[in-house]
Amino acid sequence: MPKHDSLWLKSLRWIQKHLVHTIVVPQDPFADLNLDASRPLAYVMKTESLSDIAALSEITAKLGLPSPYEPLVANGVIAPRVVCLQGRKPLFGERAGNEPFLECFMRLLAVHKERPELDIQLVPVSLYWGRTPGKEDDTMKAAVFERENPTWLRKCLMILFLGRHNFVQFSNAVSLRYMADEHGTDMGIAHKLARVARVHFRRQRKVMTGPVLPNRQALFHSLLKSESLRKAIQEEAANKKISETQARETAIEYLDEIAADYSDSLVRIAERFLTWLWNKLYSGINIKGAEQVRQLHHDGHEIVYVPCHRSHMDYLLLSYILYYQGMVPPHIAAGINLNFWPAGPMFRRGGAFFIRRSFNGNKLYTAVFREYLDQLFAKGYSVEYFSEGGRSRTGRLLAPKTGMIAMTMNSVLRGIERPVTLVPVYLGYDHVMEVATYHKELSGKKKKKESVWQVFGAIRKLGNFGQGYVNFGEPITLQNFLNERAPNWRTELADDPEQKPSWLTPAVNVLANRVMTNINDAAAASSVTLTSLVLLATDQNALERSLLERQLDLYLTLLKKVPYTTYTSVAEGDGKHLVQQGLELNKFVVCADPLGEIVSIEASQAVSMTYYRNNIIHLFIVPSLIASCLTHNEQIPRQQVVSIVADFYPLLKAELFMGIKDVPAYVNQVLDFFIEQGLVVETDTLTVVPEHTSQLLLLASSVSETLQRYAIIFNLLANRPKMERSELESESHLLAQRLGALHGITAPEFYDKKLYGTLSVKLKELGYLADNQDKSNINRIRDQANSLLRPSVKQTIVASVTAEHTV
């Protein structure tokens, strides 16, 4: 290799500096890959390439990593900084073997044998010029842009045409000390490491580019030849008394309506547009957990992303983030309502496939869609769908629609060999563009049909939207899930493949709820959500600035010292910083008087801000319930607090998709935190410290509306134990409306009929709606709920129930 200060390399670096734009994956290798700056480091690359090393040199200079041009000097030993598995491919003839790599690696291992204190980190580095996966029928393009083994001439063309799409990916370091100690230092281990490295680089390329893309028409013909679709076409012809040719044409129409038409060229163009858009909209996008997803891809998993659905922006945000995190944007299941011109064709070429809201018993459409989904899984394309079925209008997660999850499960049951893993994704925003529209819809206004004019209208309103949040939750591998739920599932299916197992529907329901729980486990507590939570807990949605900052400091400390889960992310900075962020986003207003500053939510924005509060209400609902127990009792035993929370937790879990593994332990951790912060003292019982009562009262207010709902339900059940589920839902809803009118409750979810439906299902499951119900349990929970209400609210509920049911 020429010297790094030679005229040739200086010229090459100058050319690349003007032609090449490099994206680094991950963005911070030290933090994400646990690199140790104190230990010597060498880079491992697949192929020797001057242009690749020049691109790597630019990146290492920016990241503060050793330059690939500098020799590795460790304990008096001088070695190359870059080790390549294979030499450059000449324009004609064959490339040299891997002997130089083996010799270099043997030298490094020999040094470790001689010097026990030495530990060199080997960091694999992959470079990609463009990320086109190629098509099954590629010809000329593949010949010109052969990416696996390009000659220097092809590499020049790649830099010229694809230089703006250069990716450098760092992988986890390998300790040579560990290799030498565990596996020895002979030539055999050198050969083994070379094989492992080749497999690693091959897998990394698959993760970065994805599988080859099929010709769309060839895909259709392949699907139509499948046994299940041929059978469905025959049944369609028989049932509708049409010819099989006509039924086949209908199936082709369905395929054309459904199938994506992924275009790498469009994705590259969209990447530039979205980069401009995100920079215009957001001051930053916070990402947590991407490394675990990259590892799943690397390990050969079929990935299904299941994000929550807040906004139409969700379709763009997740794909953009995955692209920049070195993964292929997924094929996205989009509602057929988004298939309007010109957005529909663009979404389709960006990887969207379209699904009808309801299959309406259309067996042929169902068979076509299922076969298409199976094909995506079989060919290794990652998939994304929204299990809620639509955007949340309240900020809370919606009850999951199980159709797509059931079809994914059926694909596994039909014999996909690779592990299929659902990756829950929490998407959050400091500003959701549709919030105002959502609340108009909740107040009864008819939902507008999506059109291009709505898109232009949204773009017209672009402004400072703060930050976005993408948190990847705990993955769920379906084969492992099935092993837990039905250990003999493989045997059962082998014995009778056509028979639907009795355990399948319950298993799908459990899985859907686990996905939603894992999404909420990965919530992002931001400046807007936290400040909304505090201000909406006050009577006038306003608080003195210093008190607001103090309350936010308490919440931040709680989330860090008693973390909800390891997947949850918490805003950086202190309460003062969070308040300032919210003010800069114009989410809150501040006014000054002689006694200080007051931060508030404008009356016109109060309902809208409940949306952001509801994004994270589940993180604080149990601490809030504990605070309510403490502030409504002068003294209370610790065990009584644990018991009260245990009684309400099943309903909270059903309503808010909570996943606290050990509720008593969590309650005790929160109580210990309150004691540590000086809010509570404990002798034989727990007592609130008077000067901190206001902080606990503010925290307790966050659960008040939830307790009011439970008080309504259990007062009704105590008054009429034999009440039917449908009757309980309707009467609870009517009583909630009365309570809201009398006490000024404006939160949309308080009047949500679906929420009362969810609670009634859980009540039946818990035995509270059974004929042989234990009335003492109902009375106990009613009394507990009543005891935690304001006297005026309690009086309204009790009087209304008594008046309604007095005979």
UniProtKB/Swiss-Prot annotation:
SMART domains: PlsC
Primary subcellular site in the record, as a coarse category: membrane
Record's bilayer topology term: Peripheral membrane protein
Subcellular compartments: Cell inner membrane
CDD domains in the cross-refs: LPLAT_DHAPAT-like (cd07993)
GO molecular function: glycerol-3-phosphate O-acyltransferase activity
EC number: 2.3.1.15
Keywords: Acyltransferase, Cell inner membrane, Cell membrane, Lipid biosynthesis, Lipid metabolism, Membrane, Phospholipid biosynthesis, Phospholipid metabolism, Transferase
An individual GO BP term: CDP-diacylglycerol biosynthetic process
Motif placement: HXXXXD motif: 308-313
Source superkingdom: Bacteria
Reaction(s) catalysed (UniProt annotation): sn-glycerol 3-phosphate + an acyl-CoA = a 1-acyl-sn-glycero-3-phosphate + CoA
A Gene Ontology cellular-component term: plasma membrane
Enzyme class at the top of the EC tree: transferase
Family: Belongs to the GPAT/DAPAT family.
Protein name (record): Glycerol-3-phosphate acyltransferase
